[in-house]
């Protein structure tokens, strides 16, 4: 009898042990899952906090120097442009996509930034072709004069606005001055962390969103400052463009051909920086050798109808709205006839998009004109 009781106890103990073992395993898994979840949550919170601080300390470029906000605006656009302009201020202050649409039905966008260097233009072009293949790319050739990195401030206004990509990494590597570091572009918080003690109202207002500062890449100015006497450029020891500039122009030419895009070279009608005849001859020769179109608008200012007493806001460096609209009408006809760009007016979705854009365009024009009138009456 006692033996049977002992056997029953042993049997029950054997039954209990596997069940207890299973319960322990389940309990351990739950604990482990909670630990993993807590670790993941901690990492997410830390990364989110760092991202938030980074977004807070990065310059917003909403007032004053707004050029740093231009590059990023492109990503919110529908990617179905006929023409993409790529280059420096000689494009984004001198060409009005609104006029090209209203008068020629050409849908265009300017991927411009201050002192955009030719290698930056190339990598912006490379990146753009991942989003869309326009019929024409227009490149302003003023940046052919540069063959070395220039300034971190200008680099930042182009590169910080680019989305992360291999094109951005290569653009950074090509652009950095000796004092700059790649890691500070990849993680801008490392560069801007000191701004945490210098934050302004804009840093909080535009933390999660930014207002548009351009109209399809065009920066509008309606004020007027007449051009005075423009001196000729100082003599140079060597007028030849550097081989690095030609290397990137060759890359642009090849990239456009590979993608079935027509590359058009232009020189905007800015009175200075001075554009030497020797520089112009090199561009004419390059265009001839590569079967490209090249237009130097400095040679046709009278045909365009430009008056540098009324059509510039800074003495001839850039055109104001009046001058930009004149140049856009002139160039729009060239794009339509010589680049065979048909009018897209009548496309419902595009018409609706431009209706909203034109409303904002004329609203800003009116606002600036009213402000200018008030300033003149002071």
Question: What is each model feature region?
Answer:
Residues 154-259, 347-378:
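Secreted/periplasmic serine-hydrolase-like ester/acetyl group-modifying domain
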Residues 37-55:
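Hydrophobic membrane-insertion alpha-helices, especially the h-region
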Residues 277-352, 356, 360-378:
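C-terminal regions of proteins
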Residues 86, 90-172:
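Membrane-embedded segments
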Residues 56-79:
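Alpha-helical transmembrane signal-anchor/signal-peptide segments
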Residues 108-114, 237, 241, 316:
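Acidic/histidine-rich helix-loop elements
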Residues 136-148, 207-304:
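Conserved, well-ordered alpha-helix/loop/beta-strand core segments that scaffold catalytic motifs
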Residues 1-34:
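N-terminal Lys/Arg-rich, disordered targeting/topogenic segments
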């Amino acid at each position: 009898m006692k033996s049977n009781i002992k056997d029953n106890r042993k049997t029950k103990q054997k039954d209990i042990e596997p069940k207890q073992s299973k319960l322990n395993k389940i309990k351990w898994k739950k604990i482990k899952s909670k630990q993993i979840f807590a670790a993941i949550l901690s990492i997410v919170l830390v990364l989110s906090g760092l991202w938030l601080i980074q977004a807070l300390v990065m310059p917003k470029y909403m007032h004053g120097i707004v050029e740093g906000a231009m590059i990023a605006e492109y990503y919110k656009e529908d990617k179905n442009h006929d023409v993409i302009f790529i280059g420096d201020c000689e494009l984004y202050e001198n060409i009005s996509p609104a006029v090209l649409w209203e008068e020629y039905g050409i849908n265009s966008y300017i991927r411009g930034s201050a002192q955009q260097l030719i290698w930056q233009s190339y990598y912006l072009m490379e990146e753009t072709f991942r989003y869309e293949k326009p019929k024409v790319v227009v490149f302003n050739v003023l940046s052919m004069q540069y063959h070395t990195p220039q300034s971190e401030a200008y680099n930042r206004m182009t590169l910080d606005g680019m989305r992360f990509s291999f094109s951005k990494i290569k653009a950074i590597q090509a652009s950095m001055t000796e004092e700059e570091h790649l890691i500070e572009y990849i993680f801008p918080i490392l560069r801007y962390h000191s701004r945490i003690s210098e934050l302004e109202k804009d840093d909080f207002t535009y933390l999660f969103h930014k207002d548009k500062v351009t109209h399809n890449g065009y920066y509008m100015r309606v004020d007027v400052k007449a051009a005075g006497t423009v001196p000729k450029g100082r003599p140079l020891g060597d007028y030849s463009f550097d081989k690095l500039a030609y290397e990137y122009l060759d890359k642009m030419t090849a990239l456009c051909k590979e993608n079935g895009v027509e590359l058009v070279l232009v020189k905007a009608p800015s009175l200075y920086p001075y554009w030497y005849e020797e520089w112009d001859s090199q561009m004419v020769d390059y265009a001839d050798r590569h079967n490209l179109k090249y237009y130097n608008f400095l040679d046709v200012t009278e045909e365009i109808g430009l008056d540098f007493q009324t059509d510039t806001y800074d003495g001839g460096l850039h055109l104001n709205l009046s001058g930009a609209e004149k140049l856009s009408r002139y160039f729009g006809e060239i794009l339509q006839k010589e680049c065979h760009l048909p009018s897209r007016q009548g496309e419902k979705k595009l018409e609706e998009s431009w209706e909203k854009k034109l409303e904002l365009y004329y609203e800003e024009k009116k606002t600036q004109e009213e402000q200018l009138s008030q300033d003149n009456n002071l």
